[in-house]
UniProtKB/Swiss-Prot annotation:
Quaternary structure and interacting proteins, as annotated: Component of nuclear RNase P and RNase MRP complexes. RNase P consists of a catalytic RNA moiety and 10 different protein chains; POP1, POP4, POP5, POP7, RPP14, RPP21, RPP25, RPP30, RPP38 and RPP40. Within the RNase P complex, POP1, POP7 and RPP25 form the 'finger' subcomplex, POP5, RPP14, RPP40 and homodimeric RPP30 form the 'palm' subcomplex, and RPP21, POP4 and RPP38 form the 'wrist' subcomplex. All subunits of the RNase P complex interact with the catalytic RNA. Several subunits of RNase P are also part of the RNase MRP complex.
Protein name: Ribonuclease P protein subunit p20
GO biological process, one term: rRNA processing
Domain of life the protein comes from: Eukaryota
Keywords: Cytoplasm, Nucleus, rRNA processing, tRNA processing
Lineage summary: Eukaryota, Metazoa, Chordata, Craniata, Vertebrata
Gene3D superfamilies listed in its UniProt record: Alba-like domain
TM annotation in the entry: none
Coiled coil: none
Length: 140
């Protein structure tokens, strides 16, 4: 799989931070289901944990409890997603199990020129993601 491509450092050398502004696009998300939780680093950990627990317990207005939830983490939020899943499992006294899948997500960055003499560019990069299924185990 030998490809003739420019080395990454050569491409980076062409992009002068004075000439271009980096704009990171939002990652592509699948259609959101009621039992999907997207974890990020901006929201408080306890708030995200409470939201997951609320979904599993059934909420406040007599809603049906979810039998499973999916916790999604991207990049730096992977550790937080794992921690939330493990906290939920530890607090359930054995009634919850977790199953994790990892993937790679393609992200697109826009490089907007500061002057009109240059063309706008896009750059594609990969980032790691985790998808954790937290589900109730039926007692035997």
């Amino acid at each position: 799989m030998a490809e003739n491509r420019e080395p990454r450092c050569a491409i980076e050398a062409e992009l002068d931070p004075v000439e271009y502004t980096l704009r990171k696009r939002l990652p592509h998300r699948l259609p959101r289901r009621p039992n999907d939780i997207y974890v990020n680093m901006k929201t408080d950990f306890k708030a995200q944990l409470a939201r997951c627990q609320k979904l599993l317990d059934g909420g406040t207005r007599g809603q049906n409890a979810c039998t499973e939830i999916y916790i999604h983490g991207l990049g730096l939020a992977i550790n937080r997603a794992i921690n939330i899943a493990l906290q939920l499992q530890a607090g359930s006294f054995g009634s919850l199990q977790v199953a994790a899948n990892t993937s790679t997500v393609e992200l697109v960055d826009e490089l907007e020129p500061e002057t009109d003499s240059r063309e706008p560019l896009t750059r594609v990069r990969n980032n790691s993601a985790i998808h954790i299924r937290v589900f109730r185990v039926t007692p035997k």
